[in-house]
Amino acid sequence: MADQGVIVITVGGGGIPVVRKNGRLEGVQAVIDKDLASALTAIQIGADEFYILTDVPKIYINFRKPNEQALDTITVEEAKRYLAEGHFTEGSMAPKVRAALMFVEHTGKPCIITEAGRLGDESCGTRIVR
């Protein structure tokens, strides 16, 4: 689709989680994580790459500290280590990195986390690879 000039954006949030009980759908208390749902969609459709768009050009370790470091390309193992070390905050970059890991581990294909306005700028973004 991208070759035809189409970029598909799905799973934008706002869904209501439900379960089927006695033939009826009932709402339940839950959170639909749009990053993980997007990763699952990308896996299921056989995407060649998975882009997660955010408000920063790359992901960082030591974010907003004197030793802040932008990451260009990291492996699955490095991403897992940075998550375990607490470099990515919940409600912000941590769910995005987990979604990237899910996609890369299931497909072996890269995930790019980048700023929405810089999509297509190959100098931007963090690539997560095997």
Where are these regions (language model features)?
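C-terminal catalytic "cap/lid" subdomain
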Residues: 1-130
